[in-house]
Amino acid sequence: MESTFFSLGNRVKGSSFKSSSGLTGEPGVEEVYLTIDTDEKASFADELNSLYSTYLKTAEQYSLSEDTLVFSRFYIADIANQKTVLRESEIFGILKNSAVSIIQQCPAFGGDVSLLVYHIKHDGHAFRKEVFNCDTENRRNGAIIHGNNYDLLWTANFYGIGPFDPYKQTTEIFKSFNTILTMKGMTLLDSAIRTWVYVRDIDNHYKGMVQARKDFFEEHGLTPDTRYIASTGIEGFSREVHSLVAFDAYAVKNLTDGQIVRMEALDNLPPTIRYGVTFERGTRVRFGDRSHLHISGTASIDKNGEVMHLSNVKKQTERSIENVEALLSPHGAALQNLAYLIVYVRNIKDRTKVMDVLKDKMPSDIPILLLEGAVCRPAWLVELEGIAIIDDSNDFPPFF
């Protein structure tokens, strides 16, 4: 795997992963992740203009385009007051040409908006892409990317609707997601790989989301004996104040037995079902030329499921990194293989302490976004997530 990390000024960091060839001898596809920050001294409109020009410059320099665009997510400080300006901006006008998510999780440094973008390149050839919307205001949206061997489905901005009840809103969201899977010839058990579940006032509403997800999974064959889905459950806010849950997801069509692998590190973290939660610590997806290692939201936990280092955000950050390393290691992967890292901090005043640890413990070239987001237990002060990409060689068709 040819991996490259790059930066453009002090606001853009990126990673690129490309295999030399698949089993057919054809050149492998290239995956590119970008993180872009803004200047806190600018107005929100000016931040968006800056984001637009910075993204265009980066895209031009690294041969990215709307044809290679797969998924993006805006992290903003105040969705209630900034959503309209964002949706009318030039940068949104570009990124809505694939799956695009907007969530309120205030960037810890810089301005009011940060951006994560994912592109796939295949020797300059455009892939076939279907962008779809699931409501009249074009907010619930998604894209299916058609490859030679697999179809990649991304859904975004599935905000909670209905009664002011996290259980009912979560159930409706998963039903809607499952309907899309069915329409695209997929199933939850065979195809769903990764979810992000954002919960408003997580200290009060997480339990209802967890129970709804557990019940839905049991109905669709996701159990401790089969598998769950890699996931992050974190505080975040969608557009409506009465919307308690928001949801992004990723699924892959045409996977076969053996391609989805449960990631565990039992000396560090117990299975989540031990304390009634239904997600994988991590999920490896094996392709013929590479593996994707999806790391779920990972906090300062011990092998018995207890919080470690109460009230010490630096020690919690260190333990979270250790746990990520423990999940990666059995698969021949390390922190350096991460395409990006997202870090959530409960108290934004802890941002410098957390960043000091990240600078000390993480490879310096990994793109990192540090965001405000309370974790599912009040005692957890910080949480990490990301994806690693490594070489693989097997009889499965190569990626994409």
Label each PLM-derived region with a short phrase.
Residues M1-A339, V345-F400:
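N-terminal presequence-like segments and the immediate start of the first folded domain
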